[in-house]
Amino acid sequence: GLGDVYKRQPYIPFKDDIVDWHEAARDAMNCFNKNFYKKFSENCNKYFYLPHRSERRGVGGIFFDNLSSLCLEDSLNMLNSVADTYLKSYLDIVLRRKTTKYSPTEKEFQLIRRGRYAEFNLIYDRGTAFGLQSNGRIESILASLPSEVRWTYKKSNEYKSMEKKLLQVVNRDWNV
């Protein structure tokens, strides 16, 4: 079956970016089936979840695999639509935020939060597990991991405050 993912994992979230992201995903899915966005958004929230942290990995989007309800042509058109929408939405956010300055504390926060990405990929991701179990090329399988990641035992009060704000955003249902 067919599968794809369209998601974001911001470290410093902006509400308008998240809403625009989800609206674009919804609009892309509605061209093919009005029920796809809700279903695939829920799939995304369930799949990209870290049970050992009790948190989602990002602000969601859409996720589907083994999709077989569309004919081949419509499936390919939907994949193209998802890819085009992803690129446009992401570029819109980059252009909107490209001049945003981040403090050293925010950069440190980003490095620590990237650890969640690594944790998910190494513990829960089916694609990573499949690649490792099938004796695939390890470097290729792990190439998607961030080159810089940090874990800390004792977190500053500023970090705890940033994490609390982020988790309120991440664990919210953003379906539009």
Located regions from the model:
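Extended, compositionally biased non-globular segments
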Residues: 73-129, 165-176
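Alpha-helix initiation/capping motif
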Residues: 14, 33, 132, 146-149
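TerminUS-proximal long segments
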Residues: 138-176
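Long, contiguous hydrophobic alpha-helical segments, chiefly transmembrane helices and signal peptides
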Residues: 62, 117-120, 138-145
